[in-house]
Design a protein with these regions (language model features):
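Flavin-dependent oxidoreductase catalytic cores
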Residues: 1-133
C-alpha cells in the first residue's frame, strides 16, 4: 500500500493475463494518516477486478483496535462503484454480521479470525440471517 502505482500495474497485468475473475483484498490504507481506500477502490475497479474485499483496519494497525466499517460503507455507497464490495474485520457474531449488511450495505462479509476454533460460526450466521434467531 506504499506503492499504489505498482499495485495497480500488477492488478491490471493479472486481470489481462487470466480468463477467470480477479478479486482483491486490501485494507483501509497504510496508517491513520493514509486511509486511501475510497480512491483506491475506484482505481482497482478501473483495472477490471470482479470484486473488492476491504479489511476495516490499516496496515499499521494489523489486528489491534476495532475495525472501522465507516469507510467500507463509503466505498459501497459510492455511486461510481459497481462491483461487489465485501467487508471484513470484527465480524464475530451473527448479530454483527447482520449489522454489517444492514448498516453498511455490503454485498458480502468475509469471516477471518472469528472462525478459528469455531468452524460452526458460518452455519450460525446463515441461520441468523435467514431467521433472525
Amino acid at each position: 500500500m506504499q506503492n499504489i502505482p505498482q499495485m495497480l500495474e500488477i492488478t491490471r497485468a493479472v486481470v489481462d493475463a487470466v480468463k477467470i475473475p480477479v478479486t482483491v483484498k486490501t485494507r483501509l490504507g497504510w496508517d491513520a494518516n493514509n486511509k486511501i481506500i475510497v480512491e483506491l477502490a475506484e482505481q482497482l475497479q478501473d483495472c477490471g477486478i470482479a470484486a473488492l474485499t476491504i479489511h476495516g483496519r490499516t496496515r499499521a494497525q494489523m489486528y489491534t483496535g476495532e475495525a472501522d466499517w465507516t469507510l467500507i460503507g463509503e466505498v459501497k455507497n459510492n455511486p461510481r462503484m459497481h462491483i461487489p464490495i465485501i467487508g471484513n474485520g470484527d465480524v464475530t457474531t451473527p448479530q454483527r454480521c447482520k449489522e454489517c449488511f444492514d448498516r453498511y450495505g455490503v454485498d458480502a462479509v468475509m469471516i477471518g479470525r472469528a472462525s478459528f476454533g469455531r468452524p460452526w460460526i458460518f452455519k450460525e450466521m446463515k441461520h441468523y440471517l435467514e431467521t433472525g434467531e
